[in-house]
Amino acid sequence: VIDAMVRCWRDGYANPASQHQPGQKARRLVEDARERMAELLGANVSGPRADRLIFTSGGTEANTLAVVGIAQGDRKAGPGQVIVSAIEHASVLEPAQHLMDLGWRVDVLGVRPDGVVRADLLAGLLRPETRLVSVMLGNHETGVLQPVAELARACRGAGIAVHTDAVQVAGKLPIDFRDLGVDALSVAAHKFGGPLGIGALLLRDGVSLEPLHFGGHQQWGI
C-alpha cells in the first residue's frame, strides 16, 4: 500500500479532471482504482446502467453523503421520512438528526436481544413519504451481520432507497452490491488495508444525490 501511494504521489499528482498529459495520467490511475474497488464490491462502473463509485475522505463522509444526499436528492420535494436502525454509527445517526432539525421525520428501527435489526417491524414504519432506509451491513461493536438484503426487498416495491454502511464488512467478507439489492453502500479504505483518509460511496444507477460540496465538477458533480 505504501509503495502504491508513493508511486501515485510521484507520478499521479495532477488534477485528474485536467486535459493536460499529467492530468490524464492521474485520471487513468483514479479510474483504475475505481474499477478495482467496484470489482471488490460486486458492482459494475462501466457500460450501460453503470453504478457510480464516488471516492470520499472516509466512511464518515460517505455515510453523510448517502443519508443527507439521497434524502434531499429530489429538490422539488419537501421534507419526508428517513428510517435508521438503533445501532447505526454516529456518521449515520447524526446526519439523520440533522435532517430532523430541518423538519424531516426520522424513525428508528429496533433490534432483537441478539443484536439483529427487527426486519419484521420495517413495514409498520414505512410511510408514503419515506425516502430512505439506512441499516448497516455489519455492526462495528458486536460484529453482527444484518438482514440488509431482506430489508432492501421490502423497500424495492415501494420505490424507497436503501443505504448500507459496509465499513466493517468490506474486505473481510464477500460483498455483492447487486445481490444485496441496495441503492447505496459505504466503505472506508483503512478498514481493509488501504490508506487513511479514503472512503467510497457506491450508488446504483439512477439514484439522485444532492452534493455536500459545491464548486467542483469531478465525480458527477458530487
Q: Where are the language model's segments positioned?
A:
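Pyridoxal 5′-phosphate
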Residues: V1-I222
